[in-house]
A protein has these predicted regions:
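Active-site-proximal loop/hinge segments that shape catalytic or ion-binding/gating pockets
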Residues: 2-222
Length: 222
């Protein structure tokens, strides 16, 4: 089920059609965390940066200072929001590639509509100076605001040269200013069978209660 209705127009461009294709196929948005945080997430929900339940922080401490900035739509700090990515295979995940406990939570896209009165879209890493924000779902269809071909680029570095513009756009975010409860979590993506086994053994009851699948998906990791 797409989160946006299909727009048909004689003037529709190839880029707009590309954006719509991504939206039509979108089933989940993603949040990265450490496996040791899972139990508290399932119990208390996903909360913003200031929550007291987080045991392990995998965020970039240098970037954290920039996420103290205040966005101009609602007047909140970026850290006041729970962050989600369209494309989890980005620079933040790459930075944590050596952490065997890093997992990716896949949340039903309905979480966006259910929190539409307190969410933002950023067209790149929300901490970037060039980041633009919107509270309007239709802007996801506008390639002048966000280009999903860039967001889902396969890489941001070619021949040893980094493209920081693409790097930032691959980290475009959905920001939700509320607790996001476990009922929205559809999947837990891990990089190996050992992680899957550990999670299922530790949290079997919770996984069954919320109907959450634990999936080994190497393609989502580095």
């Amino acid at each position: 089920m797409s989160i946006m209705p299909l727009i048909i127009s004689e003037k529709i461009t190839e880029v707009i059609m590309s954006n719509q294709a991504f939206l039509d196929g979108m089933r989940e948005i993603f949040h990265m965390t450490d496996r040791n945080n899972l139990q508290n997430i399932l119990l208390h929900g996903l909360q913003n940066h200031y929550n007291t339940y987080k045991q392990v922080d995998i965020s970039n401490q240098e970037v954290n200072a920039r996420r103290e900035k205040v966005e101009r739509i609602y007047g909140h700090k970026i850290h006041d929001y729970v962050p989600f990515y369209f494309n989890p295979r980005n620079a933040m995940l790459y930075r944590n590639r050596s952490n065997a406990r890093v997992i990716i939570l896949g949340l039903d896209v309905r979480v966006i509509k259910d929190h539409r009165n307190g969410f933002l879209i950023s067209n790149r890493n929300a901490s970037a100076d060039e980041a633009k924000f919107s509270k309007n779902l239709p802007d996801l269809q506008d390639p002048n605001f966000i280009n999903f071909d860039d967001v889902f680029s396969s890489r941001w570095c070619n021949n040893g040269i980094a493209n920081n513009d693409i790097k930032q756009k691959m980290m475009a975010e959905i920001l939700i200013n509320d607790v996001v409860y476990s009922r929205y979590i559809c999947s837990i993506y891990v990089k190996d069978q050992a992680s899957k086994k550990a999670i299922k053994e530790q949290l079997a009851g919770d996984l069954k209660m919320y109907n959450i699948n634990v999936i080994v998906d190497l393609a989502k990791f580095f």
